[in-house]
Amino acid sequence: MEGIIKAICISKQKGTEKHPVQDIEIIEDHGLEKDAHAGKWHRQVSLLSYEKREEFKAKGANVEDGAFGENLLVSGIEFTSYPVGTQFKMGDVLLELTQIGKSCHSHCAIYHQVGQCIMPRQGVFTRVIHGGHICVGDKVEVIENK
């Protein structure tokens, strides 16, 4: 299975919309350079299916890249269909799936702006096994557990 990076998004603070960039350095065991969610934990990089975001937009929501706090918006891959431990390769970068969905304990700024959030159901989280440089348009390869 292969997908394409449609957007790369970062933010300075947690719980806010992220803004798109054309390319970025992903740091091993840390996350995206200059992103608030980067650090030594299991949710270093968040991914969201472009198709799921487009389905949400088709219901009338006015959302842009990064609106749900996703780091990578990727077309062609249904992330929630893969188990924890699945890896995603983008050039030299290797990410490992650590969490599917998340709890939304209190409605964050994203929820208040959009009315709901798809990250609790459709977002996935990864840790960085190997860092490198990625760009919008790069291919994403799924490496399934054996």
Go through the PLM ranges and name each one.
Residues 1-146:
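Metal-cofactor-dependent catalytic cores
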